[in-house]
């Protein structure tokens, strides 16, 4: 069965036990940690070369998902603009949010949650609309967006890299992502696909951004030059081990496991900056890594909670490949393995984010 990423990469829907709404705690921590960076980028829109104050600020949230994540991002933007306009003594502009994700995203649950923002900012004139589509292509009219924001989305690839021998045999058998045992071709394939896809994200956003527009991108990344370092690959190695167990139990076909690779890449800061420089549409105003400790005694020290956090974003793509009927068994086994790893100190202990703030270059023209 051919895998069309645009049809299956989305977060778990609804508001049930395994939904993204109930399990997006890690992403919220990333948003909180990066809030000052986003706030500064938003407020820089009011200190540029605009001949007249902005009357409408258009904001795009790429890969917005659902639940508290997009609502918190919207709140940060609104509060940043309110604060800056208060400082400058200027009239508060209207704010238009363009909430983008693939068509499979649960936009209904997303829109239901907007009442929280509505109640919180009754005196602010803001609007929200859905913008379904892939950020690997064009989404918005030329020169229309003042701010493009994305948190934990653009590390998803447009497709999994093709990792086979000349004879068409899988080279990453028993794994679903890079690992210590993967041959060099696997690492090269993933990096090449990331470079192609991230370049397309930049290339398609450039004409859409207004002059002096900003783009804030937050990606799940890595600090190490080694893309198979434990904190990076632990999740996918854990799930591959659980899937291998299901193969041994006759619950899934080994060929399905051997032929599957997740369309996901954890870049280093250097890899991100290299693509930005080569693509050439933006200047980098800020670039850094943000580290969250997820080991030890914290909210993720419970194996069950941690597995729910993994399941809420990985289940849709895994169920498409291996079947919905084995998902409970898969994540139960993963929790069992994780609990044992906790005892031995083998689990991942850090979550790494790459944060960049980009400004559209002023010398570009679009015809």
Swiss-Prot record:
The note on the cofactor says: Binds 1 Mg(2+) ion per subunit.
The protein's required cofactor(s) are namely: Mg(2+)
Q: What is this protein called?
A: Probable 7-methylxanthine methyltransferase 2
Q: Which residues form a coiled coil?
A: none
Enzyme class, spelled out = transferase
Top-level taxon:
Eukaryota
Keywords of this entry = Magnesium, Metal-binding, Methyltransferase, Transferase
Give the organism the record lists: Theobroma cacao (Cacao)
GO MF term list: metal ion binding; S-adenosylmethionine-dependent methyltransferase activity
Q: Which reaction does it catalyse?
A: 7-methylxanthine + S-adenosyl-L-methionine = theobromine + S-adenosyl-L-homocysteine + H(+)
